[in-house]
Every structure is written in C-alpha cells, then in structure tokens.
C-alpha cells in the first residue's frame, strides 16, 4: 500500500516539472464552529421532508432557501459535498490521495482562482453573491453541528468555492477535461473530445397539439453515475422572492440545473460541438519559458502551485508543479511539445448567475435571456411552459473562427490569425421554437434532427467552423421513432416511451450484434448456440428477455472500449467469454436479463430492464461478478415528468435510483429502488396541504425546535 502510493506520486511527478518536494504530517484543525452557527442565524428556512425524504425548502428570501437547500443536502450526502468543495479548491488529493492529484492540478492550470480573486465582486450581481453566501452558510452550519465528520480543509465554505465549482464543471460537460487529461498524458489530440457515458442525458417536450388531452409534457432525465460528485439530488424550492422549482442538482450546486415550476421547465443533454482549440507553440530552444508569436519571443506566464497529496493516515506530501499560460490560454508541456488550450467558458464566472436567472425565469423570453448571457458554454436545452410553448436550444458559446484554417486539427500558435477573441451571438445558435410537429428532443445528438422535418434547423445554415455534431445516439433514434409514430400521446404513452428498453436497428449496438450473428461458427458448438441466440435477439432489454444477457454484455464490452479510446477487444473472443460465463453460472447461454441485470443498494437487490444508451438508460460495472450478474452504477440518475394540463394545473412525477439519502441508517437510503426497478414514478406533493399530509420531518436549520411549525 505504502509503496504503491509512493510509486503513484513518482508517476505524477513525471507529468511535469518539480521544484519542491516535502513530506509532512497534517495536523487536522477545526474551523470556527461558533462563527458558523452565528452566521447561520442570519438565515431562516423551513425544510419539510415528504414521505420519500425529498426536501421541500421554503423561505422569505432566495438566500434563505439556498441556505436550507445546502443544509438538507448535507444531511443526505455530506461526504460528497465536502469533496466537491475540495475539488473546487484544488485540494481534493489532500484527502483522497494521488488519484485526485491531476484534478487538483487542472484547477490551477485553468486559472480558476485567479479569475475569482480578480472579478468575483465585479462580475457577479449582489443577489447572486447573496445566494452563494446563503448556500455556504448552510453547509457551514451543518459542519459546525457535525465537527467530527468534517474533512481536513473542507470548512468553512465560501461563496467563491461554489463559483469555482461551476467554472470547473461547465466546460467538462463538452469534454474539456478529456482533452486536458489526454495532453497531460502525452496522448494524441482529439477535436472535439470524445463523448463519454457520464455526459449522457435526455429531455423531451410534447406540445398540446401532440397530446391526447391537450397537456404540455416535459421529461427531464439527467443520466450519470448513481453516486459520487456527479450524482443527482432531488429537491423543491419556494421563496417569497419568486423562486419556485422542483428538480435536480449535483453536489455543490445551490441551484437546479434541470427543473420545472408552475410556469416553465427545462432539461438538457450534454452537447459536443467544437468549443476548444489546441495550439502547437514554437518554444525557444534557448529558454524554455519563451514561445514565438507574430515574429516575437514572448514569455509564458509561469506560476508554481502546491499539490498536497495524502499518502496514508495523516502523512501527506506536498509537491510544487509548474503552471504555464500563453496568450491563447493554459499551456501543457509534454514529451510531444508545448501545447496551449483556448476554450469556451475560459475565465467566465457568470455560469452560476445564468443558472440563477433560469431558476427565476417564468417565460420563454426570460429563460432565453439567461442563456443569452453566454455564460453557459454548452448544453442542449429543451424548454416547455404552461402556455404550450416548447423549444430546443442547442446552446453554446461558439468561437468566431477564421474559416480559412482547419479547426479540427491542432493550430499553429505562433500567429495571431488563429487566435479567436469573440463568440457568435446567442441569436445564431440552432433552435427549434414552437414547431408544427409538436415535439422536441435532446439526447446527446445533432440539433439537426431534434424534431420532424421540415421543422429542424438546416445544417447548411451554420458555418462548419462551429463544429456542430451530426450524429444520433440510440436514445435519439428511438425517441424520434416512437414519437413520430404517435400523433396523440397520452400520459401513459409518454411514460412508456421514457422507459423504452430497446435499441434501434441502425444503432451501433444493433450493427455489432448483426455482424456477430451472421458469422459462420461451424464446428464450434458453443459459438454456434451463441450465434443462434443473437440471430433471434430482438434488440430489447426487458427483464424477461433471454437474448439480452449475451448480446448486451458482449456489445457493452466492445463498444465501451471504442467510447473510451481503448483498443477494441476482438468481438468473437468477447462473445465466447460471456457464453462460457453464462453457461457456468446459469447452466444455459440465455438466462433472462432480470437474472443478470441488478440494482443493488445495501440489502436491496432487484432486477432491472434497460441498458446503456437505451431510453431506459442503465450503465453497468464492467463484465460480470462471481455470481454471473452485473450491477447498475449509472444511467437514469433522475427522472422527472412535469405536466401542465389544459386548464393550467401543474403536476410533477419523479424517481431516483436509490433514495434521497446516502446514509445506510436512513429510511430513505433505498426506498425509491423498487419504484425505479419497476419503471414507476412517485407524485411530488406541490401544494402545502398535500405536502403536510405526508410530511415525515419538519425543521428550521439553526433555529430552536419550538420554532418549527407543527
């Protein structure tokens, strides 16, 4: 263990220059808990838990509600929230060790805290800063009350920490982190970066014209890991200042990233346009800190930053790493040369403010005004409102590039001609607003097929230098097929489409399975039987499907290697391996998918339908375990269906994979798992009367118990 940690540190050092190395023991000191309690007294929020433990937070001010939201989330998942804060500071390796060191380095490389220190009070409005302060105060109050659970350096939290977290995460949605990690490892440049399963999501809106009952329907369905820093948390917020949203957020967010209110709602999937450029710099052979630009030698901005890494117990090592910046942006030096990165969202603090405005929006115009700030660098939004208006907005801060250059390749960094400085205005991004087709979708796919023709944007109307993606995910293919075939969608239809567990005939999975099924396995009894199963497979993953285990496990193993940029394993060898395992564990090659696909949480162990990139999106651990089963670890992280009826009534139904709490002792640790496994939704209580009828807990954080309403 000790040797492994030391070797890992040595490997990290090899990624860049080292100027200082010191081992030390960290003395764990506590923050001023009394000051945190005193600061918390300035806020007044009421947190009511419904029968599933979902927190409904109310308060007079938005800042009060943010305070209560932070406190409630800390009650449910304090360890993850603390790690989010440490990640934002570039201090996570001080707790989690070498595996977090590269992430810490990226915080410094991107210059996040330099920008915050310079412009926090300038770029962010007073209401936004007040909201951030309230959220930080909620986390600090919980930490003060649970000092024994506080990680080193995790408290006190400041509003600036939350801004740093947004600045770090937003560009990662379109793949900046993959590009940076690739360059740090000395790998090849991929523009745009490869899509990853962690970035999947789904959103669909149905207009009254396509609904059987004249209702407007919105599905928001973030898809990602079920636990950890990118897991989704469900809540409801109402304030006396007009904040009224139910939806989801990820740890460290004081705002809903996807949600719905009485007037409007929105969801998104991660889009992957070309929003970053890599420049090859011409270094000075006589001075490693100079590079050529427009005929002159310019000095790189050079900083040294500390990276504290926990080895074991209280023993830490602090390294000092070189951080370089050019006119283009952050610079990485590796064995292949000197590379600069320029990316959408660079040095922009206002992402959190844009989401704040979205949370407060009550019309399409106010919602798009928030996007028009240009502070959210990507994300493909779906919008719906109570008036029946729906829209798809392929949002992005698209660089205005000189079309004479090939922006799909690394660029010469020695001339100003390749240095873009402006973005296309929001008016120029692809949009579909109130289409005659009556529906829009977003499923990590091209915006040129987000509805039925002729209502789609035309690809030729957008410059190729915008780098807009043109491919379709399986979820997009299936959603288009199902919805285009139904002119009168009922509530039951819409739910069934969300939980559709099949693959399109032209999906990557179907193409791979067809190839394997059509091969000649004569003379190999095991593969002959496997091929027979694949030929009969209907491309679906319902629980009783007997073709799914062999087909899906094989396809997942092969296609995930493609997705992650690893060498592709030989498909027939993979098929043989899983055929052998199915025979070993189940006595047959075709057990039901329910026997193999499992949702596990504590003592809960339930069968699941679905698979990767299905509308019923489920991600699994690689391969199978020693019982022949595979455990779901990601996919449909939050499912919310918001409906505005013809007469203006608002309804929200939802489900998460496990429950609202990460504590094994909580009754809400896995109480939603049976619903999730069965593809069912719970109804969220939206009126005060409905909420109080099923309230399981009511509190006012930081206030005496006798002040809590009964």
What is the meaning of each model-derived region?
Residues 2-515, 520-523, 532-710:
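C-terminal/peripheral segments of proteins
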């Amino acid at each position: 263990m000790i040797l492994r940690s030391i070797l890992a540190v040595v490997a990290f050092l090899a990624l860049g220059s080292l100027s200082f190395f010191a081992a030390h023991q960290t003395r764990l000191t506590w923050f001023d808990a009394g000051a945190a309690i005193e600061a918390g007294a300035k806020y007044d929020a009421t947190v009511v838990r419904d029968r599933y433990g979902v927190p409904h937070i109310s308060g007079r001010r938005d800042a009060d509600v943010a305070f209560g939201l932070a406190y409630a989330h800390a009650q449910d998942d304090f360890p993850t929230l603390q790690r989010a804060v440490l990640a934002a500071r570039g201090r996570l390796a001080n707790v989690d060790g070498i595996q977090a060191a590269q992430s810490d380095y990226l915080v410094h490389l991107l210059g996040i805290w330099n920008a915050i220190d310079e412009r926090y009070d300038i770029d962010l409005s007073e209401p936004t800063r007040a909201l951030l302060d309230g959220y930080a105060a909620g986390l600090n109050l919980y930490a003060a009350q649970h000092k024994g659970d506080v990680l080193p350096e995790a408290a006190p939290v400041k509003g600036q920490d939350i801004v740093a977290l947004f600045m770090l995460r937003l560009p990662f949605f379109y793949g900046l982190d993959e590009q940076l990690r690739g360059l740090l490892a000395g790998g090849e440049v991929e523009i745009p970066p490869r899509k990853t399963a962690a970035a999947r999501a789904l959103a669909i809106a149905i207009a009254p014209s396509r609904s059987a009952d004249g209702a407007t329907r919105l599905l928001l369905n973030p898809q990602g890991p079920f636990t950890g820093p990118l897991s989704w948390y469900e809540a409801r917020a109402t304030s006396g200042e007009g904040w009224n949203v139910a939806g989801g957020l990820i740890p460290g967010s004081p705002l809903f990233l996807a949600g719905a209110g009485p007037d409007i709602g929105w969801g998104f999937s991660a889009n992957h346009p070309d929003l970053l450029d890599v420049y090859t710099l011409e270094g000075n052979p006589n001075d490693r800190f100079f590079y050529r630009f427009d005929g002159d030698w310019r000095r790189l901005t050079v900083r040294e930053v500390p990276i504290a890494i926990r080895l074991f117990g209280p023993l830490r090592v602090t390294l000092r790493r070189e951080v370089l910046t050019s006119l283009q942006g952050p610079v990485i030096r590796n064995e292949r040369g000197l590379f600069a990165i320029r990316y959408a969202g660079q040095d922009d603090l206002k992402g959190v403010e844009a989401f704040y405005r979205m949370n407060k929006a009550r019309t399409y115009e106010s919602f798009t005004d928030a996007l028009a700030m240009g502070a959210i660098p990507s994300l493909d939004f779906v919008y719906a409102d109570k008036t029946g208006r729906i829209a798809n907005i392929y949002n992005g801060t698209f660089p205005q590039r000189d079309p004479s250059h090939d922006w799909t390749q690394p660029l010469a960094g020695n001339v100003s001609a390749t240095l873009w400085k402006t973005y296309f205005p929001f008016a120029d991004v692809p949009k579909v607003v109130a289409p005659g087709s009556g529906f829009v979708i977003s499923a990590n796919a091209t915006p040129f097929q987000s509805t039925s023709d002729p209502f789609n944007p035309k690809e030729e109307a957008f410059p190729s230098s915008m780098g807009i993606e043109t491919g379709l995910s399986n979820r997009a293919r299936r959603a288009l097929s199902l919805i285009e075939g139904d002119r009168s969608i009922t509530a039951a239809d819409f739910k069934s489409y969300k939980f559709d567990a099949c693959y399109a005939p032209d999906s990557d999975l179907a193409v791979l399975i067809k190839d394997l099924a059509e091969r000649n396995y004569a003379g190999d009894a095991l593969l002959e039987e496997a091929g027979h199963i694949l030929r009969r497979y209907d491309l679906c993953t319902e629980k009783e499907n007997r073709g799914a285990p062999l087909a899906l496990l094989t396809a997942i193993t092969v296609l995930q290697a493609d997705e992650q940029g690893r060498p592709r394993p030989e498909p027939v060898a993979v098929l043989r391996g899983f055929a052998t395992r199915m025979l070993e564990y189940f006595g047959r090659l075709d057990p039901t998918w329910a026997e193999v696909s499992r949702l596990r949480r504590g003592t809960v162990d339930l069968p699941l339908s679905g698979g990767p990139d299905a509308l019923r999106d489920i991600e699994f651990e690689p391969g199978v375990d020693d019982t022949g089963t595979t455990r779901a670890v990601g996919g449909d992280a939050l499912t919310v269906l918001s409906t505005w009826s013809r007469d203006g009534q608002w309804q929200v139904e939802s489900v998460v994979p496990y429950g609202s709490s990460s504590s094994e002792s909580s009754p809400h640790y896995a109480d939603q798992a049976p619903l999730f496994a069965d593809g069912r939704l719970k109804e969220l209580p939206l009126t005060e009367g409905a909420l109080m009828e099923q309230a399981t807990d009511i509190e006012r954080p930081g206030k005496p118990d006798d002040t809590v309403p009964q």
